[in-house]
Structure formats: C-alpha cells, structure tokens
Amino acid sequence: MSTDCAGNSTCPVNSTEEDPPVGMEGHANLKLLFTVLSAVMVGLVMFSFGCSVESQKLWLHLRRPWGIAVGLLSQFGLMPLTAYLLAIGFGLKPFQAIAVLMMGSCPGGTISNVLTFWVDGDMDLSISMTTCSTVAALGMMPLCLYIYTRSWTLTQNLVIPYQSIGITLVSLVVPVASGVYVNYRWPKQATVILKVGAILGGMLLLVVAVTGMVLAKGWNTDVTLLVISCIFPLVGHVTGFLLAFLTHQSWQRCRTISIETGAQNIQLCIAMLQLSFSAEYLVQLLNFALAYGLFQVLHGLLIVAAYQAYKRRQKSKCRRQHPDCPDVCYEKQPRETSAFLDKGDEAAVTLGPVQPEQHHRAAELTSHIPSCE
C-alpha cells in the first residue's frame, strides 16, 4: 500500500516511502495453535462471565444507556482522535499512521471483560459495551478512518473486515446469552462457573502475553511503533476514566469504561491489516498490533494489581477500626449506578448523593463498610 502526501500540510513531515523490514517466519504452527486455543478460551470465558450477568440489570443498561453512550464516545471518539494525534506527533510514515488509526478505530476486546471482573467493575456494563461497540464498529470504523485519513491520498482502498466483525459479534453474543440463561435457571451453579471463568481469563491473559513475546522475538522492530504501542493503551485508560468521571459516572463505571477504552480488539485489527496492506508492509504492522496487545495486557495487570493493593489496604483499615468484626461481615458491594438514573427506575439501585462529587466518594466508600453493628 502506498500513499502520496505531496502538497499535503497535514501529513507527517518524514512521510517517505521505504521498504519495511522483512522476516516473520517459522511461526505458522504457533499462530495456528494460538488462534484455535484463544478462540476456545474466549468462548468459555465469555460464557462464564455471562453467568455473572442478570437480565434485569442488562435491560436497565439498555433502557437507560448512559454508561454505554459514554463508553462508545470514548471508544470511537477519544481513541481514534488519540491515534491521529500520536501519528502526527511522532511523524509516522503514512502506512504506519494508518495502522495506528486502524487500532484506534477498533471496538473493545474480550480482554477488557477479564480485567473488569478483576477490578470489581460493572460486568453488565462491560459486556454491554463490548457487544454494542462491536455492532457499532460496522459503521464507526469506516467513518473514523474516512475522517482521519482524508489528509492522505491513498492509492489502495482500506478494507473493513465485516466478516470478522460478524464472527466476533456471534462469539460474544452466543456465549454471553447462554451464561445469562444459566444464571437465571441455576444461580448456584453459575457462581461456580464464574470462578472457573476468572481462572480461565487469567490463563488467557498469560497465553496472549507469552505468545506476543514469542512472535515478536527476532523481528526487525520499528522503535517508534513500539513506543506508541506502549503509551496508546495508557492514554486510552486515562482519557476513558476522565470522561466517565466528568459525566458523573460512579467509580465502578469509571473503572469499567477506563478498561474498555484502552483494551482494543487485536484480532479484528490484524484481520483489517491483512486485508488492506501488501506483504511487504504487513510484517511491521503486525508487529505493532501484537505489541499493542502485549502492552494492553501488561498495563491491565498493573491496574488490577494497583486496585487489589488498594482494596487490601482499605480492608486492613476497616479491620483496625472494627477489630471485633469477622472477615465475612463486609457487605456485598452495592450496585453503583449512574447519576443520570432516576430514583424510580429500580428500587434495588443504590442511589448516590445529590452532588456528583459526593456521589463518587460515597459509592466508593460504601463498598468497604462492614456490616457488623
């Protein structure tokens, strides 16, 4: 794929065509094994996480989709804009810049659901966002690419992998719907399945990280793309959290939207790269996609570790304040809700204070209040 930037002031200053590095050989069997194994594990993980979803809560998110709307705005508003600014700021070559834009325009991936579970996020919102962003990608991916690539004259059309999007959507909806049904019919068994799914999710993260490092070994890596693949997910997490906070979402939803924003669907991006670029450019761009996937897993694990450390610190603080209270006396974390929801929506919803900043503070503190009198 070649790109003509002559006479275009918005194109990066060092946008010159040169041969990319060659050589991604000897990994065909490993990639096939990784594809099959990850597909099976993703299906099982999504089924188990579906066991944590209650149909009433899911319907509440769909009926009043404030959290979903904020998440989609982060996914298809902030991420493509961030990708464009990174491409311009680092002066990427045209084919590299377009690959970064492709990554920024992709919907959320399954990894986000695993990380959301480990940070006590809103699983109903997480699964709703992943599904809705995948559906929205049918129109938003070409729209975002059209808006941000207008400054370059492309001699080859970009191809949107609609078939891959459809397969992704089916692989999300079918296991999750099955899990929701199991949770409705057999709630006790669903709890056990959910615990198993959390373990499988951890194994999935480990497989992705190890495979990414193995596939990247020996590649002729572009340092600039590696730097972008490292900071891009972090920028997504931070901007997603800030947008959720500014729209008065609860802390639980802020964590969820932050994770969903930074964690992209790597498989979908790889499919789009393979359909849009010739082999001479594909090696370097696949390297970027795999590096992004590796870094988003590492960043996610750091976020989980930081949250769990904070959670243990709060629990120890409560133990010191209430030494006679046993460990099991902590109340189950209440369902945090958006400040936009009305009181009449559902009686079981935990309502926050009137002021938005108080809403955030109270929603977080109530998850650590012991139930002992």
UniProtKB/Swiss-Prot annotation:
<keyword id="KW-0739">Sodium transport</keyword>
<feature type="topological domain" description="Cytoplasmic">
    <location>
        <begin position="119"/>
        <end position="126"/>
    </location>
</feature>
<dbReference type="GO" id="GO:0043251">
    <property type="term" value="P:sodium-dependent organic anion transport"/>
</dbReference>
<dbReference type="GO" id="GO:0006814">
    <property type="term" value="P:sodium ion transport"/>
</dbReference>
<dbReference type="GO" id="GO:0015293">
    <property type="term" value="F:symporter activity"/>
</dbReference>
<comment type="function">
    <text>Transports sulfoconjugated steroid hormones from the extracellular compartment into the cytosol in a sodium-dependent manner without hydrolysis. Steroid sulfate hormones are commonly considered to be biologically inactive metabolites, that may be activated by steroid sulfatases into free steroids. May play an important role by delivering sulfoconjugated steroids to specific target cells in reproductive organs. May play a role transporting the estriol precursor 16alpha-hydroxydehydroepiandrosterone 3-sulfate (16a-OH-DHEAS) at the fetal blood vessel endothelium.</text>
</comment>
<feature type="topological domain" description="Extracellular">
    <location>
        <begin position="89"/>
        <end position="97"/>
    </location>
</feature>
<comment type="similarity">
    <text>Belongs to the bile acid:sodium symporter (BASS) (TC 2.A.28) family.</text>
</comment>
<feature type="transmembrane region" description="Helical">
    <location>
        <begin position="196"/>
        <end position="216"/>
    </location>
</feature>
<feature type="compositionally biased region" description="Polar residues">
    <location>
        <begin position="1"/>
        <end position="15"/>
    </location>
</feature>
<keyword id="KW-0813">Transport</keyword>
<feature type="transmembrane region" description="Helical">
    <location>
        <begin position="33"/>
        <end position="53"/>
    </location>
</feature>
<keyword id="KW-0325">Glycoprotein</keyword>
<keyword id="KW-0915">Sodium</keyword>
<feature type="glycosylation site" description="N-linked (GlcNAc...) asparagine">
    <location>
        <position position="8"/>
    </location>
</feature>
<keyword id="KW-0445">Lipid transport</keyword>
<feature type="transmembrane region" description="Helical">
    <location>
        <begin position="158"/>
        <end position="178"/>
    </location>
</feature>
<dbReference type="Pfam" id="PF01758">
    <property type="entry name" value="SBF"/>
</dbReference>
<feature type="topological domain" description="Extracellular">
    <location>
        <begin position="1"/>
        <end position="32"/>
    </location>
</feature>
<feature type="region of interest" description="Disordered">
    <location>
        <begin position="1"/>
        <end position="21"/>
    </location>
</feature>
<dbReference type="GO" id="GO:0043250">
    <property type="term" value="F:sodium-dependent organic anion transmembrane transporter activity"/>
</dbReference>
<feature type="transmembrane region" description="Helical">
    <location>
        <begin position="285"/>
        <end position="305"/>
    </location>
</feature>
<feature type="topological domain" description="Extracellular">
    <location>
        <position position="284"/>
    </location>
</feature>
<protein>
    <recommendedName>
        <fullName>Sodium-dependent organic anion transporter</fullName>
    </recommendedName>
</protein>
<dbReference type="InterPro" id="IPR038770">
    <property type="entry name" value="Na+/solute_symporter_sf"/>
</dbReference>
<feature type="topological domain" description="Extracellular">
    <location>
        <begin position="217"/>
        <end position="224"/>
    </location>
</feature>
<feature type="transmembrane region" description="Helical">
    <location>
        <begin position="98"/>
        <end position="118"/>
    </location>
</feature>
<feature type="topological domain" description="Cytoplasmic">
    <location>
        <begin position="54"/>
        <end position="67"/>
    </location>
</feature>
<dbReference type="InterPro" id="IPR004710">
    <property type="entry name" value="Bilac:Na_transpt"/>
</dbReference>
<keyword id="KW-0472">Membrane</keyword>
<keyword id="KW-0812">Transmembrane</keyword>
<feature type="transmembrane region" description="Helical">
    <location>
        <begin position="266"/>
        <end position="283"/>
    </location>
</feature>
<dbReference type="GO" id="GO:0006869">
    <property type="term" value="P:lipid transport"/>
</dbReference>
<keyword id="KW-1133">Transmembrane helix</keyword>
<keyword id="KW-0406">Ion transport</keyword>
<feature type="transmembrane region" description="Helical">
    <location>
        <begin position="225"/>
        <end position="245"/>
    </location>
</feature>
<feature type="topological domain" description="Cytoplasmic">
    <location>
        <begin position="246"/>
        <end position="265"/>
    </location>
</feature>
<feature type="topological domain" description="Cytoplasmic">
    <location>
        <begin position="306"/>
        <end position="373"/>
    </location>
</feature>
<keyword id="KW-0769">Symport</keyword>
<feature type="transmembrane region" description="Helical">
    <location>
        <begin position="127"/>
        <end position="147"/>
    </location>
</feature>
<feature type="transmembrane region" description="Helical">
    <location>
        <begin position="68"/>
        <end position="88"/>
    </location>
</feature>
<dbReference type="InterPro" id="IPR002657">
    <property type="entry name" value="BilAc:Na_symport/Acr3"/>
</dbReference>
